[in-house]
């Protein structure tokens, strides 16, 4: 009997269980997307990847620029990945640690997105391409390119994490409310169900905007950075992050659709129950003239 009761319990609440499953998948996708490039273990979840193009005619100039000092030798081979919460630098030369007094060395290191200007690599990755004389002055101005600064600008100024953070918090809140209405014999379920409809629609709208902005930011960097750097820097789009963003949106949309269908089903069931209630006999028909003429026959 217990097994039958459990089967009936889950069968009756299967739509809400699907909603919980969709919600839980969305939470995991959004969290892994948020912490991408926060440490070397999850740097594969990047938004944009930058590196110097070794086919560029300026590549030899970049090599010579880094060869001027033993501390920067080989930095032209670095790969920089930009994420929501941080920036990861990969393929760091092995000799770089000895010249910078690093106690432990790894060829990959990640920094928080707003704490880059103070790290040694930020200054060491600056390259001076040429000196251009001004038409109004005999003095020459330096043309400086910093690949790490471009990655920082992507994470700080182009693709912001705040919409994603708000979506994660609201999605976790929605999971708790769905879990609440799934448990039987709890009060205020009607109010919570109505609130869930509003909350799910808000989350879909919020992350819909966030996913579209992520798509725009990734493609803007992909198209603008190579041209603006005279094709010195190549850019690769983070397909994994883009897929996670759109799949999480799809699951949130499914979640909202399921909740609306459950609400409409419950409203229809309630209406059918009200319609099936038999009408009570009118106690005011005390005289034969008050009733139908069919009942007034002698």
Swiss-Prot record:
Keywords: Membrane, Phosphoprotein, Transmembrane, Transmembrane helix. The modification Phosphoserine is found at residues 288, 296. Induction: By mating pheromones. GO terms for biological process: cell morphogenesis involved in conjugation with cellular fusion; conjugation with cellular fusion; cytogamy. The chain crosses the membrane at residues 17-37, 163-183, 195-215, 243-263. It is a multi-pass membrane protein. Changing residue 241 to T: In strain: CLIB 388 haplotype Ha2. Changing residue 203 to L: In strain: CLIB 630. Required for efficient mating. This is Factor-induced gene 1 protein. It comes from Saccharomyces cerevisiae (strain ATCC 204508 / S288c).
């Amino acid at each position: 009997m217990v097994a039958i009761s459990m089967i009936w319990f889950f069968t009756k609440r299967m739509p809400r269980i699907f909603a919980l499953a969709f919600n839980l998948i969305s939470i995991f996708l959004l969290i892994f997307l948020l912490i991408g490039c926060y440490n070397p273990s999850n740097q594969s979840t990047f938004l944009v990847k930058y590196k110097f193009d070794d086919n560029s005619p300026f590549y030899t100039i970049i090599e010579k620029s880094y060869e001027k000092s033993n501390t920067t030798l080989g930095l032209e081979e670095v790969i920089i990945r930009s994420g929501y919460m941080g920036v990861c630098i990969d393929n760091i030369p092995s000799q770089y640690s000895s010249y910078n007094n690093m106690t432990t060395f790894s060829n990959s290191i990640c920094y928080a997105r707003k704490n880059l200007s103070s790290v040694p690599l930020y200054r060491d990755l600056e390259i001076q391409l040429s000196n251009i004389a001004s038409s109004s002055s005999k003095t020459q101005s330096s043309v400086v390119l910093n690949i790490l600064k471009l990655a920082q600008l992507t994470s700080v100024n182009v693709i912001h994490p705040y919409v994603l953070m708000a979506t994660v918090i609201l999605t976790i809140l929605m999971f708790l409310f769905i879990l609440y209405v799934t448990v039987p014999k709890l009060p205020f379920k009607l109010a919570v169900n109505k609130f869930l409809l509003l909350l799910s629609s808000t989350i879909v709208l919020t992350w819909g905007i966030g996913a579209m902005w992520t798509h725009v930011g990734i493609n803007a960097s992909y198209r603008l950075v190579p041209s603006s750097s005279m094709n010195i820097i190549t850019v690769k789009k983070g397909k994994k992050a883009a897929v996670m963003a759109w799949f999480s949106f799809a699951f949130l949309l499914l979640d909202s659709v399921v909740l609306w269908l459950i609400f409409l089903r419950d409203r229809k069931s309630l209406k059918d129950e009200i319609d099936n209630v038999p009408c009570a006999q009118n106690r005011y028909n005390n005289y034969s003239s008050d009733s139908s003429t069919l009942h007034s026959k002698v």
